[in-house]
Amino acid sequence: MAVKIRLLRMGKIRNPQYRIVIADSRTKRDGRAIEFVGIYQPKEDPSVIEVKSDRVQYWLSVGAQPSEAVQRLLEKTGDWQKFKGLPAPEPLKVAPERVDRKAAYEAEAKAAAGLAEAPTKPAKKAPKAEAAPKTEAAPKADAPKTEEQAGAGSGEQG
């Protein structure tokens, strides 16, 4: 029996997702598979390629032939070079770790709460100087008014 390592298409229209499968060469593209050995999601950035390396190595060793597309994927992951005894390829582009959305939300909420609380709390004022004489601060009632002070209080314009 001729065995192939090929892609089985899954997913939606315009959003393909593939499983890397071991199948008889005479079966349909999306037909029954002998074994599932990985996934390939080309629409992700970077593309997701997950392969069960030990199972692929086994199937290659017993004579399974990869399709052209699968062979390119195996070259990117380094499994093809491992099988052929060639030097390993350069490392793949790795997706950055995603930030936990709940933790990020809570951190933003705490930061916003900290900013909102700051204006509501009055700042501590410096204590007033008690040594300053109070006589200069408030004018005495029996002191004679100057012309400027007297004119400002009356409605006369001059």
From Swiss-Prot:
Gene Ontology terms: biological process: translation
Cellular component per GO, a single term: small ribosomal subunit
Key words, A-Z: Ribonucleoprotein, Ribosomal protein
Recorded GO MF terms: structural constituent of ribosome
Residue ranges with Basic and acidic residues bias: 127-148
Alphabetized InterPro entries for the sequence: Ribosomal_bS16, Ribosomal_bS16_dom_sf
Compositional bias (Low complexity): 111-121
UniProt KW Ribonucleoprotein keyword: yes
Positions of the UniProt region annotated as Disordered: 111-158
Pfam families linked: Ribosomal_S16
Family membership noted in the UniProt record: Belongs to the bacterial ribosomal protein bS16 family.
Classification via NCBIfam families: PRK14520.1, S16
HAMAP family reported for this sequence: Ribosomal_bS16
Name of the molecule in the record: Small ribosomal subunit protein bS16
Gene: rpsP
